[in-house]
Amino acid sequence: MVSGRVQALLEQLRAQGIRDELVLNALAAVPREKFIDEAFEHKAWENIALPIGQGQTISQPYMVARMTELLELTPQSRVLEIGTGSGYQTAILAHLVHHVCSVERIKGLQWQARRRLKQLDLHNVSTRHGDGWQGWQARAPFDAIIVTAAPPEIPTALMAQLDEGGILVLPVGDEQQFLKRVRRRGGEFIIDTVEAVRFVPLVKGELA
C-alpha cells in the first residue's frame, strides 16, 4: 500500500513529465527515508535534494526518475553507477535490473550505502571504492552508465566502457551544468542535451 506522501510525489513526478511506470514503481518501492539522516526524515518524500554529509547530496526524486528513465533499462541491462553516495539511486536501479555495479570515491559513504542496501535485502549490487572518472574497466562493457556528480567534461573512460547501443547519462559543466545523454552507435557517440541541472562536482583521482 503506497502512502499518501508517496502517492503525492508520484503524481508530482508524472506532472513533471516522468512517463515510465516501472521507474515510478521503483521509486515507490524504495523507502527514501532510509537513505538520509534522521533530522531530514520528515522531508524524505519531498521533491528536493538533501545533504548526506561529506559535501554530498541525495538527488531530488525528479532527477533520480528522469536520469533513470533516460537510461532505457531492461532487466538484463548491465549498469554502472558512478557516485554511490547514499545508495538511494543504486537501490532504484537494483529494483529495475538484475545487477548493478557502483563506484564511490568516499569510503565512508560506500560502507554506509552497502549497509543500507543489505538492510533492504538488495543483494544484486557490487560496490567499489575508486575514482569514478575511470569507471570500472574490469566489469565493462555496460549497457547503461549513470553519473550522479558533474564532471566539467564527459570522461573518455566512461564513453569507452559503453557497449554498442549503450547509454551514458550524466550532468556536465562547472558553473553552468546540463544533463547529457550519450548513446554509442558504431564508432560514433551521439550526444543530446536534456535540461539544465545542478549537481556537486565529480572529483577526479582523489579518494577519501
From Swiss-Prot:
Keywords: Cytoplasm, Methyltransferase, S-adenosyl-L-methionine, Transferase. HAMAP family: PIMT. Belongs to the methyltransferase superfamily. L-isoaspartyl/D-aspartyl protein methyltransferase family. GO terms for molecular function: protein-L-isoaspartate (D-aspartate) O-methyltransferase activity. Its main location: cytoplasm. CDD domains: AdoMet_MTases. Gene3D superfamilies: Vaccinia Virus protein VP39 (3.40.50.150). The lineage of its organism: Bacteria, Pseudomonadati, Pseudomonadota, Gammaproteobacteria, Enterobacterales. PROSITE patterns: PCMT. PANTHER family: PROTEIN-L-ISOASPARTATE O-METHYLTRANSFERASE (PTHR11579), PROTEIN-L-ISOASPARTATE(D-ASPARTATE) O-METHYLTRANSFERASE (PTHR11579:SF0). InterPro entries: PCMT, SAM-dependent_MTases_sf. This is Protein-L-isoaspartate O-methyltransferase. GO terms for biological process: methylation; protein modification process; protein repair. It is an enzyme of class 2 (transferase). It is found in: Cytoplasm.
